[in-house]
Every structure is written in C-alpha cells, then in structure tokens.
Amino acid sequence: TWMNELKPSLVIGESMGAVHAIRIKGVPHILISPSLNAPFVLGRLCWLALIPGVTHLLDRIYKPREGDRQKLHFTYDVLRKYVCHGKAALANSSRSGNDDFFFAFFGTRDHYRRTGIVSVRTWKKHFGTNYMMYSGTHFTEEEHIFDKVLPLIYKVLDIK
C-alpha cells in the first residue's frame, strides 16, 4: 500500500480532504475546517442530480473560485457514495476507539459552519475537545498556517 511505501509521519486534511485524512489509520491527524457532515448531506441530496440540468447548474454555482482547491462534480453516482465515505471516516474516530492523535482548526468566519457542513458540535461528538477556533475562513489563510498549523506540526513531530 502507499502507507507502507511512503510511511507518513503525519496526515493533514482540509475541508472534504479532512474526511479523507481521517480514514488513514496509524498516524497523527491535523485537520483544517473538517467538513464532517458534508458526506451525509451530499449523499442524502444525490437524487437531485438525477433532475436534468441540476448537475450542470451545481457545477456552475460551485465552480472553484480563486483560492479554492478543486472542483466537486455533482453527479448522482459521485454523490451517493459519500454516505459510505463519511461513515468509514467516523468509524476511525476517537469515539469509535481509535487512539490516533486528532486535532482540528475551525475558522470563526467559515461560511460552511452556518450550513452545518462544518460543525464544531459534530467534531466534539466524535473527537472530543482537541480543536482550536481561530479568526479565519473556511480555507486557512497563510498567516494562520505560520502561527498555528506549523507550530502544531513541529510539536506533533517533536521537531525543535
């Protein structure tokens, strides 16, 4: 597997990438704006993509803006698989008995927190109180990488 080949010391994930990162076992996890509820919302709404024109409309509405990471293509087949993906991630949570290190950063101005896609309450339910709120948005601004994320990486990896 790629884990055996690369032997990562740490995994970092942001937004939906945090859900992917949580599924990786045996390494510390640093997560930024983890969208823990997104797989379940997308999975429940997948039927909308069967309506002609909806996939195209959502692709236009949610096209990556400057600074966004990558496109999410809203097809039925893609969206319906998200529920299993979310369940697999949460099965690897602290609440489910995993003793990996998990830490999350949440921006106070994260527009996805208003929708429930990103939820501190969901984080606390599955991972406890190992998180930090910071004055930022959904995508971590550079200054927060330097003053919050990097120091935690150094601490987790015991780099002096």
Predicted regions: what they are:
Residues 1-5, 138:
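Active-site catalytic motif of lipid deacylating hydrolases and related acyltransferases
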Residues 3, 16, 132-133:
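Detector for methionine-enriched segments
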Residues 4, 22-23, 125:
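Solvent-exposed polar/charged
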Residues 11-22:
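Gly/Ala-rich beta-loop-alpha elbow adjacent to hydrolase catalytic centers
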Residues 28-159:
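The alpha/beta-hydrolase serine catalytic core
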